[in-house]
Amino acid sequence: MTVANVILITAGASGIGRYIAELFLEEGNAVHICDINAEYINSFLKCNPKATASQTDVSKYDEVEKLFQDIDKIYGKLNILINNAGIAGASAGIEDIPVDNWDKTIGINLNGMFYVSKFAVPLIKVNKSGSVVNISSTAGLMGVPNRSPYAASKWAVIGLTKTMAMELGPFDINVNAVCPGCVDGDRIERVIKADAKNQGKTAKEIEAVYKRQSSMRRFVKAGDIASMVHFLCSDRGHSISGQAIAVDGNTEGLFNWLDD
């Protein structure tokens, strides 16, 4: 990977996306992020003045189109795409999932990835080399009780990834999915609180259940995910394609608190 690369990271102003963006920026790459949250964008740009940004809701096609108009105006090219935008969705049994929450989760986690990829792929193809990393989840590798919108969207991400890898391989573009386990931070805290409420347990009890899923008995760090993404976009990782790579401390199995 050379410093001439232009990299787009969706939901790049906070969390995993910010870690990824700052890792690429450290090498002197050109980084453009998009995010729905203007406050997060301003904070990111204040700390990373060499980066550029667009305020974008990836679930809205017209906003994604505007995002790529920005990229074309600023850089005129794109080498690497990191599809990171996603939300956790509702925590409830499938019969209690609000239809609008299902639609919102699929809209951001899957439709948004499709919209962004649709615009990005022609730009990357022109270079006859490049990388795409789609952020899925260990929830895309197994079922997860009370998380049907999220799990369904993340399974779909892996299917999209494998298909893109087949289509783009002849252009020397590798495409992979990175599947984080529970990542320490605000999102898992919100999920834990929702599960605790639904199950009549304390947040500490639910947190312990989640941590017991992993052989390492801890949550992974956002930096762990960023390091894997960076490797897959480097020369050393370029022959890896079409894979769904878990970064999860080895998930041994699902939590069983629904049986309590």
List where the protein language model places each region.
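Canonical Rossmann dinucleotide-binding motif of NAD(H)/NADP(H)-dependent dehydrogenases/reductases
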Residues: 2-32
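The beta1-alpha1 cofactor-binding region of Rossmann-like NAD(H)/NADP(H)-dependent oxidoreductases
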Residues: 56-66, 99
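Short C-terminal tail/terminal secondary-structure segment
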Residues: 88-91, 142, 230, 241-260
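Substrate-binding pocket helix/loop in short-chain dehydrogenase/reductase
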Residues: 92-94, 98-106, 210
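Active-site helix of classical SDR
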Residues: 117, 153, 161
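Residue(s) in the substrate-gating loop at a strand-loop-helix junction
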Residues: 137
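Short, small/polar-rich loop/turn modules that mediate ligand/substrate recognition or access, typified
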Residues: 169, 174, 240-242
